[in-house]
Amino acid sequence: MARARCGQRFFSPPESSFQFGLLAHDAGFKEPPHYHKSVTRLIDDLQQMFVVQRGVVAVELYSDDGELLREVILKAGDAIVLIHGIHAIRVIEDMQCISVKQGPFLGLENDKVFIDFKK
């Protein structure tokens, strides 16, 4: 008899201000109705998640000194969670994606710092 799947596994450290994980439950599982407590949290490092709906996009991940560490190609249905660090996107095919990050939004002037790495 197969063991029932019931649980969650989070991949982010507990202290991270952006939590992501995997929920796995067998058919018939029901979580009781609930809401999440209102707790004041200090967020000083914005995290972001992209879910590509259509098209193709390259996500470039950089070290703090400008070294390209990795390039990840995402297609429709793919997702990436950016916890910390410098990143860029390069659109390969016309794309549309969902972007999720913490709020509130404080305006463009407070949102991004653009880096010009000299090659």
Can you say where each PLM-predicted feature lies in the sequence?
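Conserved short histidine dyad/triad with adjacent acidic residue
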Residues: 22-44
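Double-stranded beta-helix
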Residues: 90-119
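A short, compositionally biased micro-patch
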Residues: 26, 52, 75, 82-83, ...
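Glycine- and acidic-residue-biased ligand/ion/polar-headgroup-sensing regions
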Residues: 26-27, 45-62
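Short beta-strand His + acidic residue motifs that chelate non-heme Fe in jelly-roll/DSBH
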Residues: 33, 59-60, 80-82, 86-92, ...
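Short acidic-glycine-tyrosine-enriched beta hairpin
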Residues: 63-84
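A short, N-terminal "cap"/entry segment at the start of jelly-roll beta-barrel domains
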Residues: 1-24, 117
